[in-house]
Amino acid sequence: MDINERISQYRQDIKSDRVDMSFGEIINMYKEHEIVISPEYQRAFRWDKQRQTDFIESILLGIPFPSIFVATNDDGTWELIDGLQRVSTVLSFFGELKDDPVKNNLVLHSGNIVPELDGISIDSIPLDLKLTIKRTPCRVEIIQKDSHFEMRYELFKRLNTGGEGLTRQEIRNCIFRGFQNYRYFNDIISNCANNPDFREIVNISDEAQEKMMYEELFLRFFSLHAFRGYYTEKVIQDFFDKIMKQQCETPNKAIIDSTVNKFNQICSYLRPMGYEIFKLARLNLSTSMFDSIFLSLSTSTKDFSQIDCETFKSRVQALREDPEFKRNAGAASSNASAINKKLIIARRILLEDEAE
């Protein structure tokens, strides 16, 4: 297939339309559940009060802002797929973000251009300015329901990555919820991410936690432990996408159960060693260390719990200092070849007498 045929094929897979609507119309559609913001997407509303104030100020001053994107569901409703920060800001200011009471009822800060906005709420704003916000047009790009799912996913991913966008795990959390077994597999991920032992050995910031890093780390282990032989993608995040999509469509419950059991056993074993177990150079949490330790233990043919804590910690330190391991833990260390090389080294050092 040549380049023109390829482009023509994919252009046919996505069907779109556009319309200009006022924010008042968008607010009313949201109240009537005609525009839907999924809970998985809404949780990523993270603009602070100043950013929200800046956007309201921009509307009042007539400063242009980007379009929002919606996808048409089978029942005709629209699902917001880009523009969460802007739409949620307007909903919050008008007191309509009722599913998120902590972030609802925005009170503005001082604007960069209009400092008099400080302390203004929907109850105190002059009527003419309130109507200015409600009547301001917003370009809505509509992805029709007969667009191919893969293209809807690709669009969502591209629109929501970078800047104030979502992490890849947050995107997975949103986009795959339409699959029949999404709730089953996502509950597995959530339960493992909240394993108390896991939380003790993986120490991440509140911001990283909010961006679902615990969930992604479990998905990382699950994918590499159970399906490492199917890792052919150039980018490891695409591999995680593939595995999560497969398990949300047709979960392999036997593999899921055995992998979850392994995960829980490893977390319990590592807990006394603390979160520094995954440290490498300046990184408090190195994915090279995470992969090497978890995968070495999960693929061990012997009872790793018989290795006492201090012995294992000393072996981990030896792994950190191993020149060959450090070479493979550098750039491009998440490609399939590098992961396999690191695992061979890790098993030799951590398990001593076991080979890959």
Annotate each language-model stretch with its function.
Residues I3-D20, G24-E25, S38-Q237, E310-Q317, ...:
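Basic- and aromatic-enriched surface patches that contact anionic nucleotides/nucleic acids
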Residues K234-R282, M289:
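Small-residue-rich helix-loop
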Residues G274-E324:
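C-terminal hydrophobic structural anchor segments
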Residues Q317-E356:
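Eukaryote-biased recognition of C-terminal alpha-helical segments
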